[in-house]
UniProtKB/Swiss-Prot annotation:
GO terms for molecular function: DNA binding. Involved in cell division and chromosome segregation. The keyword Cell division applies. GO terms for biological process: cell division; regulation of sporulation. This is Probable cell division protein WhiA.
Amino acid sequence: MSYASEVKKELTGITVHRDNAKAELMALIRMNGSIGIADHQLVLNVQTENPAIARRIYSLLKQFYGVESEIVVRRKMKLKKNNQYIVRLRYHAQHVLDDLGILQNYQIKEQVPVELLKDEWMVRSYLRGAFLAGGSVNNPETSRYHLEIYSLYEEHNEIIAQMMNKFGLNAQTTARRSGFIVYLKEAEKIANFMSLIGATNSMLQFENVRIVRDMRNSVNRLVNCENANLNKIANASTRQIENIEFIDSRVGLSSLPDKLREIAETRLAHQEVSLKELGELVPGGPISKSGVNHRLRKLNAYADELRASEVKQ
């Protein structure tokens, strides 16, 4: 089972009261529903690839409207695609759709009732239904952080984004596959969204993974920084040693002032140590790190002068 399916499975087990159930059904039917006519009456079909969601729709219709629907399974053999589960309401579909306020001229309306947007818990329930109908979320252990909800209509997609942003989620929208999506890419916002639609256990699991990932990334950054510093120190040390050996081969270290000679000889004798450690090893020391660095820069400059004079000759 995918991570997104686990989140949805948790959501289908949430207990809700009538108004919240209606809001959830509004989203599920608006996004996955279609209307037909049989025996001179409306028939409602709500389609999903997730059996838990199909059972959820069936249960909500029975619990809050007292109607019996049926679940039709269409098995897809080609390319081993998932089965399709259709919750079909043959009787009382007109009553359910009228009560939900999503039927207009025998079509499902794109608009969301204004009164729903005024109630925080109904908005949460609508978002839960929208996620069940068209949502997905990446596994935080293996992928980049990403949660999205797909909608066929742009206006409805924008309404979902507005709902999400009522909770400060910074949701963004874009066109996708003959439809539109609203998406989140920030880990904290994804966790907040899962919490507000009721996926508490999934949110806690997500947060645990995020903490481990963040710690691992922090350690990696520290290791990379340390490696970069070590490389920088090694390169600087190599240059210092090359310059000291060059000076020794041309004029001899004994020709240097005592302070420069001491640091030069100490560096040759201790090529792997840091500047701080080098300052503690100088016979006339100890010398501060800045003092050691100052003397080594003088040696580097002197070596450059000697090379320049050779070029002129």
